[in-house]
Amino acid sequence: MMKKLCIDFGSGYNPKTGYKTCDVTSFPQLDFQYDGKDEIVGLREKSVDVFYLRNVVHHIPDLQRTFTTLKKYLKLGGKLVIIDCNKNHYKTNVFLDNLWYRFVGNNNEIFISKQYRDYINVLLKLGFKQLYYKSFKEKEITKYECN
């Protein structure tokens, strides 16, 4: 049986156990690097079974472009799993991200969207099929299938 290719997209410092890693940064421990535009260096198109994005969506400058790129690399029927802050807690999340990245980490390169963006609608317009949605506390979990 062929092993599934699962990638933690935006994994940064703390990747999901058992997943390959991919980020826009050039950390040496990453398996793949996203060029921030249309390519994931070192990855074949239509080869990914699952992209996992945890606390990443609010750091993506151009949602449509990035999701279009991920779709290009997903197999037909491949999954996109997103865990991110929900709309009701977004301002708190932005405050904490700014505190962490700008003051503690002194990192001005990481994008932080100042307002909540409807990434779900972007995915649906790109042809992803929503399989699951749950909002709890400050987070929401969504799962999509690539058509």
Describe each PLM feature range.
Residues 4-40:
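Class I SAM-dependent methyltransferase SAM/SAH-binding core
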Residues 52:
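A conserved beta-strand element that flanks and buttresses the S-adenosyl-L-methionine
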Residues 58-59:
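A short His-aromatic
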Residues 64-76:
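A short glycine-rich, Lys/Arg-flanked "PGG" loop and its adjoining helix->strand segment in the class I
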Residues 81-105:
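Conserved class I S-adenosyl-L-methionine
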Residues 110-127, 133:
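Short alpha-helix
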Residues 129-147:
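Conserved catalytic loop of SAM-dependent methyltransferase domains
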